Amino acid sequence: GVPFHSRGAITDEYLAALKVLWTHDIASYHGKFVAFENIYTGPRPQRIPPIWVGGYSDAALRRTVNLADAWHPIRINLSDFQTNGVPRLKQVALKFNKPMPNICPRIKLKVTQEPINSEDRLAGHGSLSQIRDDLLTLEELGCQYVLFDTYNEDYSVPDHPTQGLAWLVTLADKVLDLAGETIRG
């Protein structure tokens, strides 16, 4: 029931209000969509939860730079991510004189036996070698975390949760150095 054109402004206010609640014992906030006065919030979190914002729109990048700790894009094509996504985020950070937020993408994992040779290939789709290269590129771009999304929207695939778990085990065995929190050489 939220008007489409108001979603961004509402999200901005909710994020700002959360930060007030997390950083004050007695919190007040007065906005267009959220308002509260003298709310006792204790005990406050010992560590303020990090806020990750997704999306590729200009508004999402502004929201990330101004209100979040990390940018969380999903379903990324590495070529576009390198030449468009990350540079745009840097430009927005410079425009607002803010530090560059962490970059923590979610990649849809789909391990194949053979390489996928397509300009439209998503990061995380392809052979183990391609996925290793994707992760190395993300590391070079300064990504702090990478989430592997194994959720398969294709319900015609039997045992799709089992397949996702198998992909994660394979990555852990052959691509990732879990103890070192890095990628195997």
Model regions and ranges:
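Active-site-adjacent structural elements that line small-molecule/cofactor binding pockets in enzymes
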Residues: 1-185
